[in-house]
Amino acid sequence: GIPCAESCVYIPCITAALGCSCKNKVCYRN
């Protein structure tokens, strides 16, 4: 539920390496 300051509209979350996932076009973590 914590925003990772990254969007995933056009490309996947680079922050996925930190445990972030795409939700509502924004990368979130927990």
UniProtKB/Swiss-Prot annotation:
Quote the entry's note on domains: The presence of a 'disulfide through disulfide knot' structurally defines this protein as a knottin.
- Coiled-coil intervals, chain numbering: none
Q: In its UniProt entry, what is this protein called?
A: Cyclotide mden-G
Species, as recorded: Melicytus dentatus
A matching Pfam family: Cyclotide
Disulfide bridge partners, by residue number: 4-20, 8-22, 13-27
One record GO biological process: defense response
Pinpoint the Cyclopeptide (Gly-Asn) cross-link.
1-30
Describe the task this protein carries out: Probably participates in a plant defense mechanism.
Q: Which domain of life is it from?
A: Eukaryota
- For the keyword Glycoprotein, the answer is no
**Which PROSITE patterns does UniProt cross-reference here?**
CYCLOTIDE, CYCLOTIDE_BRACELET
InterPro entries, sorted: Cyclotide, Cyclotide_bracelet_CS, Cyclotide_sf
Stated family: Belongs to the cyclotide family. Bracelet subfamily.
What processing steps or modifications follow its translation?
A: This is a cyclic peptide.
Q: Keywords assigned by UniProt?
A: Disulfide bond, Plant defense
